[in-house]
């Protein structure tokens, strides 16, 4: 049977974490002979009783649950530290503290990953189901990406929701080879690696309930004006971040990609920042894309202005 490590980062999550822990322990992948799993948790300095709950679960399920307290470094560093510390395993899954996993989430992920290539890093993710704080479905939803996942998308947009990500030992080794000094989010970093050097599978079927509440920043407004405001706000917030992230990607993995056309594309993307006409030619000659047509149009403007 394969081995699987579920990696959770917690911070003041006492309100919902019991439901999440119970859903993790109810995963049927081990009963069905797909993968034996353990849950490894790093607490990022909680002060609301989260640590007491973690200690309770570790005491009740010592063969399944372990946790430790780290310094308050934020969610990105917390997940990367977990990847550095955990034992070797066939697969790894990222997990948030306030969601709810359907019992066959890991079974589905392992079945897909088992069928993917063995000579490259592989990543599985799925579309989350939006629910309210009581786990009741919301009218709005995260729509499936209309375009195929790929590096030309990953350079400028992330479609991987971290709490749905499951990946193999090869991808883990590439992440911990050298941690980035900057990345927008840990799940975006996985998307870049998988699409540049390996394979990704995006599952359109939701296998987690993605809880929306005051402590969760995902917006779900559906009015057209609100959507456009959110788009421009998101692009302004990422100003310079896309380039900075790709610079780190090239710094760390450049020696692995001498013949990799994706890496060459990323290098060219950074070079054309110096010239409007070079950016215009780049936009005409390459096929970078965002998943939504409206976002694609906005990014074309951002690229021409050099504000990426």
Indicate where each model-derived feature is located.
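Nucleotide-sugar donor-binding/catalytic module of glycosyltransferases
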Residues: 1-222, 307
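C-terminal subregions of glycosyltransferases and related glycan-biosynthesis enzymes
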Residues: 189, 211-308
């Amino acid at each position: 049977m394969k081995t699987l490590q579920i990696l959770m980062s917690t911070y003041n999550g006492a309100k919902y974490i019991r439901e999440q822990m119970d859903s993790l322990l109810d995963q049927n992948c081990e009963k069905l002979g797909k993968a034996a799993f353990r849950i490894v948790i790093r607490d990022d300095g909680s002060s609301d009783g989260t640590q007491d709950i973690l200690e309770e679960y570790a005491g009740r399920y010592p063969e399944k649950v372990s946790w430790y307290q780290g310094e308050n470094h934020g969610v990105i560093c917390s997940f990367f530290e977990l990847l550095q510390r955990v034992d070797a395993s066939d697969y790894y899954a990222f997990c948030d503290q306030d969601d709810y996993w359907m019992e066959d989430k890991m079974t589905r992920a392992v079945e897909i990953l088992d069928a993917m290539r063995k000579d490259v890093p592989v990543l599985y993710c799925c579309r989350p189901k939006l629910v309210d704080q009581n786990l009741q479905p919301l009218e709005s939803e995260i729509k499936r990406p209309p375009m195929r996942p790929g590096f030309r998308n990953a350079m400028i947009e992330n479609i991987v929701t971290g709490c749905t990500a499951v990946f193999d030992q090869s991808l883990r080794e590439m992440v911990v080879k050298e941690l980035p000094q900057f990345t927008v989010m840990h799940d975006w970093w996985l998307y870049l690696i998988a699409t540049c050097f390996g394979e990704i599978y995006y599952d359109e079927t939701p296998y987690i309930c993605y809880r929306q509440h005051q402590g969760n920043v995902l917006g779900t407004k559906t009015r057209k004006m609100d959507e456009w405001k959110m788009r421009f706000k998101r692009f302004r917030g990422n100003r310079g971040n896309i380039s900075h992230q790709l610079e780190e990607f090239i710094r760390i993995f450049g020696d692995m990609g001498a013949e990799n056309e994706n890496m060459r594309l990323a290098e060219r993307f950074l070079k054309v920042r110096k010239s409007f006409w070079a950016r215009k030619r780049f936009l005409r000659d390459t096929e970078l894309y965002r998943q939504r047509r409206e976002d694609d149009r906005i990014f074309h403007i951002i690229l021409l202005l050099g504000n990426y």
